[in-house]
């Protein structure tokens, strides 16, 4: 909800409608947007999914309801080590729970809701999570993996979710996911951009990284560090040479 200070006009924003509006009002304005959750853990040839949440008339189809209905289903099978806060209250939340929620939040805030067609799709498998949203990446993959920069397509949605306790600060969400997965020794989460379908999928596999891949990753990291160090040395050498040239010109009285 917002008021234009110049015109005095006030009303519900599109972000507010998508987040908290009624399903009917949302479909009247965004008849191209769909939400779909499927649990595909231990499926067989005859069973395509074990659980599903989509438009079925039993719930108000806005983004916040979708998020709050699906999130517990995503995390219910994750391990919860016994830990007490202040020696009294049990803590059921873990970094893995937080990373999964962050993947969900990223899908919502980076989706393009103005496309002709698009599905916010969440798939849970026994060893992975997949979050797919319509729209292409707004930053190069390298910048996203590095973190620190943020170009949320829907900053107002991001603010709404953060105010109710979901989502990290701008630019830190995806690195949080990477750090948690790395600490578990799992395969690095992968962002897949499909420019033909105009969609992005985040794949978070709970699968141990092989020793070979781990060594390769460490080698690449070392190479990048070495390249960065070499670059800095070259910059200093270049500055030193220019400084010597300037001194020579000054001494010559030019």
Describe the residue ranges of each PLM region.
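C-terminal regulatory or interaction extensions
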Residues: 1-254
């Amino acid at each position: 909800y917002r008021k234009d200070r110049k015109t005095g006009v006030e009303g519900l924003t599109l972000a507010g409608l998508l987040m908290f509006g009624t399903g009917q009002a949302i479909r009247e304005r965004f008849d191209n947007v769909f939400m779909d959750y499927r649990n595909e853990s231990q499926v067989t040839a005859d069973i395509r999914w074990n659980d599903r949440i989509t438009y079925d008339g039993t719930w108000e189809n806005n983004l916040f309801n979708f998020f709050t209905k699906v999130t517990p289903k995503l995390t219910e099978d994750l391990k919860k080590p016994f830990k007490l806060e202040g020696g009294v209250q049990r803590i059921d939340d873990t970094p893995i729970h937080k990373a999964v929620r962050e993947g969900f939040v990223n899908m919502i805030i980076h989706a393009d809701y103005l496309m002709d067609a698009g599905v916010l799709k969440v798939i849970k498998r026994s060893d992975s999570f997949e979050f797919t949203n319509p729209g292409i990446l707004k930053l190069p993959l390298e910048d996203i993996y590095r973190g620190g920069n943020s170009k949320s397509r829907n900053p107002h949605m991001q603010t709404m979710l953060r105010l109710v306790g979901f989502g990290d600060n701008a630019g830190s969400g995806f690195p949080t996911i990477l750090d948690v997965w790395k600490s578990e020794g799992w395969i690095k989460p992968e962002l897949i951009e499909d420019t033909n379908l105009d969609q992005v999928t985040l794949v978070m596999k709970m699968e141990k990284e092989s020793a070979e891949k781990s060594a390769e990753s460490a080698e690449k990291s070392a190479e990048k560090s070495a390249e960065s160090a070499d670059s800095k040395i070259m910059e200093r050498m270049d500055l030193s040479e220019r400084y010597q040239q300037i001194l020579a010109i000054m001494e010559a009285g030019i």
